[in-house]
Design a protein with these regions (language model features):
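Short, functionally important structural connectors and interaction interfaces within domains
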Residues: 12-14, 98, 123
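Alpha-helix capping/hinge segments and adjacent helical runs
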Residues: 86-98, 127-131
């Protein structure tokens, strides 16, 4: 069933999928929070995932939102979802890792010092910037 949910969402509306993880005991709080954030910003969501490991796929549905509201409110809502996730002891990326999407929100999950360390490690192993260029660190 889980594999069918994403296809059903795709066939009904424009959507944006996020991938979060929280401790299993915090899943109810995250779900309730996602619904509350969506209500505040005018979007609905379909959530599913791997409850056994706390992974939650959040499909934010455009539905009837106009393009301006979708484009302006979406990143605010995602930021709030990620802030909630981290406040519950979770991470802003589950099984897919940090990439183009989460790059904008790394400040929520990592301190400036931690990001500097990550950039330093990347520069040691990839001084020419040819491995996975522009994905997270240029």
């Amino acid at each position: 069933m889980r594999r069918s949910v994403g296809e059903a969402v795709k066939s009904n509306s424009i959507y944006k999928e996020e991938d979060t993880v929280v401790p299993r005991a915090e899943l109810p709080k995250l779900l309730k929070g996602v619904k509350s954030i969506g209500k505040e910003h005018g979007f609905k969501s379909v959530c599913y995932g791997h409850a056994g490991d706390g992974n939650l796929h959040i499909n934010i549905i455009k539905g009837d939102m106009n393009d301006k509201a979708w484009n302006e409110d979406l990143s605010k809502g995602i930021r709030e979802i990620f802030e909630l996730t981290v406040s519950l002891g979770g991470t802003i990326s589950g099984e897919h890792g940090i990439g183009f999407v989460q790059k904008e929100y790394m400040d929520i999950a990592f301190s400036e010092e931690n990001i500097a360390i990550q950039k330093g490690i990347k520069s040691i192993f990839d001084p020419k910037g040819i491995l996975n260029p522009k994905k997270v660190f240029i």
